[in-house]
């Protein structure tokens, strides 16, 4: 699951043009720095990031397939894993499309749906439910676990949005990254609604 998480973050950072993650340069920025001031450094960083993300995806599937869990449990977990990856991709598309719209034309429900698909599914639900599947938990227990993880994942994403502003260093840049990138977060949406 760590490989899956890294796969999503490498692609997400590239799509968002993020320069840092957890205070360190993102993967595509590392590639650009490594290549130096070449005219193609940025393009190369982007291209390598896409392929590295793809490799991490393949490795996450291969790692699951190589485990010693019962075949039926492993197959069920792989099916769920691929479903989570699909949801994450759809959520990323929603995030990109929301980014192209004016904040006044975006609803809190659309942002929450994006959070659920893009973040909650793979950060909270997938690790918990996949562990339950591999342990042989019933479909009902898996569903119960997914329902418990949903609000935790949403809370995590909202906290992450708040941290973007609370750890903002105006010496580094003029505005927090989410604002510079036009991210449609619940925090930005709420501020718009109140200040409208």
Protein language model features and the residues they cover:
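Mg2+-dependent prenyl diphosphate-binding active-site environment of isoprenoid biosynthetic enzymes
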Residues: 1-196
């Amino acid at each position: 699951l760590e490989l899956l998480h890294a796969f999503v973050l490498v692609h997400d950072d590239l799509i968002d043009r993020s320069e840092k993650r957890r205070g360190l340069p993102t993967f595509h920025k590392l590639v650009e720095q490594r290549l130096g001031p070449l005219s193609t450094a940025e393009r190369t960083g982007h291209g390598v990031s896409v392929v590295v993300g793809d490799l991490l995806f393949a490795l996450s599937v291969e790692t699951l397939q190589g485990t010693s869990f019962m075949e039926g449990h492993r197959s069920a977990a792989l099916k769920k894993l691929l479903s989570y990856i699909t949801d994450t991709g759809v959520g990323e598309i929603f995030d990109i499309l929301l980014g192209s719209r004016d904040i006044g034309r975006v609803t809190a429900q659309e942002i929450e749906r994006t959070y659920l698909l893009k973040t909650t599914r793979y950060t909270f639900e997938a690790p918990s439910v996949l562990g339950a599947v591999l342990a042989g938990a019933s479909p009902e227990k898996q569903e119960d676990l997914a329902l418990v993880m949903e609000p935790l994942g949403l809370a995590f994403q909202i906290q992450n949005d708040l941290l973007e502003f609370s750890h903002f260093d105006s010496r580094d840049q003029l505005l927090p990254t989410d604002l510079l990138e036009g991210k449609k977060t619940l925090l930005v949406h709420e501020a718009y609604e109140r200040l409208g």
